[in-house]
Structure formats: C-alpha cells, structure tokens
C-alpha cells in the first residue's frame, strides 16, 4: 500500500482502498476482503483475503498472534538502549478537530518491540519494530514516548519529529510495514515483504547511511522476514513502562 491512501473511508475520506476492492477481483468470483489495516500515511504490506473462509482464518491468525509483522521506521534521535520492549497503555482522546492517542496507564495494553539497525550520528536512526499488540497509532505513540518520534510524525512528535534543513520528502511519515508472516493452511507459513518507498530511500541518502543499511540488512536483495526480525526474540530483556 502506498503512503497517502486510506484503507477505509470516513466522513471526509472518499478515496480509499475499501472502495477499490471491486477493481482487484482479477477474475475471481468475488472481490477480496480487508482483514487488517494500515494508517493512511503508512506504506507497506497489506494482506487481502480472496474468500470469506480465508478472511475468517486470517482474522483468527491476527487475533491469536499466529501472524507476525515487521515495520521499519526512521526516527529522530537514537533510542537508548538499542533494543527493548515498550510497554505503555494507550487511550484515545479528542484533540483539536481530530482524535489523538495518548499514553495512559489505565488505557488498553499496548506492547511494541524495537531494535536499532543503523543510525546517522545522533540525529536519526533506522528501527525494526514489531507490534505485539495492535492498537491505533501504537508504534507512532510508542516511538514518541521514547523521545525519538518517527520522522515526519508531527502529530505525535511535534517539532522534534523533523530534521532542520531536510527536504520535502523528509517531512512525510517514515513508517513502512516491511514484512508479514501469516499461516498458509496446509503449506506452512507465507512470508511477504514490501520494497521501501522512494521517500525513505531518499532520506537515507540525505543522512548518508545507505551503505551501512545495505550492509546490515541486505537491502539490494530485499531481505526476507527472518532478517527483518533479527534480534526480536531477545528484545524483551529491557522494558519501558509508564
């Protein structure tokens, strides 16, 4: 899914993926179905179900945690420690004309694992993130709570989410659903990945960290889910709590 395309419509959203599903029938007996979502400004892997049965199985796999997702983000600053588990409850609150998610110890449980893959001095870092839970704007709020908001995320990071002197591309949200692993009945696990959008590649070049990134994650070959998840299992050693 490209950044800027909403998955579902709303009172002010008339262009969205849900309204395009008929075009994606591609000769099948029925259009595909949505089984999960990405934020409008998040790019990356989005799975659609071809049949009602597939939709039911996929929905169950997301609820039971049989599926796993890996996100990549560029954040301003560098998290310390370099890997950890963020355990901060979240709640939705009305904002200035739009709803906003805030950290709330009495809110819904929200857990995210992260790892620093590469960094450009102290100004920015590339993170691999796994949402253990799936709350609205979870990764965005959790990264901001670390003091390292996602680049371009003015909603949750304010001015700290931008790098002075950067170009237009660096002012967009730098959050990408890199890979997903889902059960494929009778065939084991299905692994899917999405190439990085141009804006994130361009930002890395501006930060002059592209060589380190390619060496760390094998970008040229488009890394598999295993390399996207490197280190995830050991992340829970450190926790952030409210």
Question: In which residue ranges do the predicted regions lie?
Answer:
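Proline-centered helix-kink/hinge sites
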Residues: 2, 131, 149, 185, ...
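Histidine-centered divalent metal-coordination motifs
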Residues: 36, 137-140, 242
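Pseudouridine synthase
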Residues: 13-21, 52, 63, 92, ...
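Short clusters of hydrophobic/aromatic residues that line enzyme substrate/ligand-binding pockets
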Residues: 86, 90, 99-103, 150, ...
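Conserved structural locus in ABC ATPase nucleotide-binding domains
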Residues: 34, 113, 125-127
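RNA pseudouridine synthases
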Residues: 2-98, 108, 118-121, 164, ...
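Residue-level signal for inorganic ion chemistry
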Residues: 47, 73, 114, 139, ...
């Amino acid at each position: 899914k490209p950044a800027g395309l909403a998955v579902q419509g709303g009172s002010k959203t008339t262009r969205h993926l849900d309204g395009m599903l008929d075009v994606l029938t591609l000769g099948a007996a029925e259009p595909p179905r949505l089984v999960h979502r990405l934020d409008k400004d998040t790019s990356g892997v989005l799975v659609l179900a071809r049949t009602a049965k597939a939709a039911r199985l996929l929905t169950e796999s997301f609820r039971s945690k049989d599926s796993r997702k890996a996100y990549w983000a560029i954040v301003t600053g560098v998290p310390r420690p370099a890997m950890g588990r963020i355990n901060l409850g979240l709640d939705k609150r009305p904002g200035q004309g739009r709803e906003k998610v805030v950290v709330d110890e009495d809110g819904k449980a929200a857990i995210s694992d992260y790892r620093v893959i590469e960094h450009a001095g102290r100004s920015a870092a590339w993170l691999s993130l796994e949402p253990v839970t799936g709350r609205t704007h979870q990764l965005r709020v959790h990264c901001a709570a670390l003091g390292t908001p996602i680049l371009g995320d003015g909603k949750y990071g304010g001015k700290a989410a931008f790098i002075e002197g950067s170009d237009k591309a660096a002012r967009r949200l730098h959050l990408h659903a890199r890979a997903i692993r889902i059960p494929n009945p009778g065939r084991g696990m299905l692994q899917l990945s999405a190439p990085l959008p141009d804006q994130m590649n361009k930002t890395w070049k501006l930060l002059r960290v592209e060589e380190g990134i390619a060496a760390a994650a094998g970008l040229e070959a488009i890394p598999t889910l295993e390399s996207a998840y490197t280190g995830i299992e050991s992340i829970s050693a450190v926790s952030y709590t409210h």
